[in-house]
Amino acid sequence: MLLALFQTKADQPNIIYILADDLGWGDLGCYGQKTLKTPNLDRLAKEGMRFTRHYAGSTVCAPSRCVLMTGLHTGHARIRGNGRSQLQSNDITFAKLLQQHGYQTGCFGKWGIGSPPPLNDPYIHGFKEFYGYINMYHAHNYYPEFLIHNGNKVKLRNELFNNWREERTGLQYEGSGVAKITKDYAPKLIADRLISYIHKAASNKSKPFFVYYALNIPHANNEAGREKRIGNDGMRVPDWGSYANLDIPDQEKGFARMIDYIDKDVGRILSVLNELNIEDNTIVMFSSDNGPHQEGGHKMEFFNSNGPLRGMKRDLYEGGLRVPFLVRWPGKVPAKKVSNQISGFQDIF
């Protein structure tokens, strides 16, 4: 898909690819969700194309993201599970390809493609700017003690329970665990940094930009789901917003609020594109890395996250693999269009 964009330099649009983490096919209003409100994502579908038969690269995080980045089907990709396999420095990713064609490249959020260092550094794989989590276990924690900015640790005001530091040894687990002091909500910091980057990149009129916004929500903090000191709540958020007064479990309020955060951040992105007068020359894509989860105290069926599909994350059924996919490119992608064409992560490259 992206290869088709490189006909002439004048044809090069900006590209924003947004990847939610463990968001189900049925979690968006435009895919039939009745309780959770997603007006900005529904707008994306209305102003572009909604795909009904789009498939993630795998049923879990790391291999799915590997397929997305390399364009290789899971049978050919290096990473086939959430283990210690990783991309090699000479592997081709679409970020590298875009960089070679003059794009400014930025990745914000959860990289999560292999471990340990140094080969899991997004810089090696085509991203000049990075802010977020390198390791997927670190990304379980919404309130980490640090994030990574271009290879350097940025200290936050959060503090883990001591036992998590002692129990989670090894580079692949660094920073993971459960926070007892929760002052900085990492998804918000990452979204703010993303918006700032779009402003900066758009000011360079001579180069288009590619942004990979890899969220770590609504994925659960799996570790927090078994931490009694915080009520086994793996879906903690700063506040529950409009869901605060609902008579539902706290974990479901947290999940609902995460969907709300995602939707609002998509709205922020669309607004800044309009503000900068670049929306007509920017492709915006939205998807999820696999089917919905049932972890951290959240129950997948509570909001019917897989819609009519069978199965969930980790299952080799439709519910584990089929994911939302929305594409908006004003004037190029028809508005209000629904595609039943089978497609997958390997097709993005």
Task: Label the model's feature ranges.
Residues M1-A4:
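Bacterial N-terminal signal peptides
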Residues F6-F349:
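Formylglycine-dependent sulfatase
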